[in-house]
Amino acid sequence: MQKKNLDVFNDSHIKVPFVLPEITNEDKKAIMSTLNQNLLTDGPKLRIFEKEFAKFTGAKYAIGVSNATAALHLSLKAIGIKKGDEVIVPDLTFVASANAILVSGATPVIVDISKEDYNISISSIENSINKKT
């Protein structure tokens, strides 16, 4: 596996490791087998994955989804987020974070990040909490 450090923020002390994917012939065969079944997001291999993942994590069940937006949407629904609710989200994030909130019927409340570590700012969260969040 080949690694590089890329400086994502010009003056930042944070380095993000860049890793090239390692795809074996076995991986390619498994991918082609799935593609040949015309089942990209559902099917027998997904059921096997869900069972194995549940077993691996010690969970009773696991649900495989096709992308992170779907996973975030299911997570929001699972915790009862609904129309009229507000969900705090950092301003430095991928659009899927806010999109999943919108698809759930809630409103994203975008807050600042910390300049020190680029994570969501605790003070921004505290200032944005209300009855709907």
Short names for language-model regions:
Residues K77-T133:
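PLP-dependent aminotransferase-like
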Residues M1-A78, K82, V103-S104, S121:
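Conserved PLP-binding active-site segment in aminotransferase class I/II-type PLP enzymes
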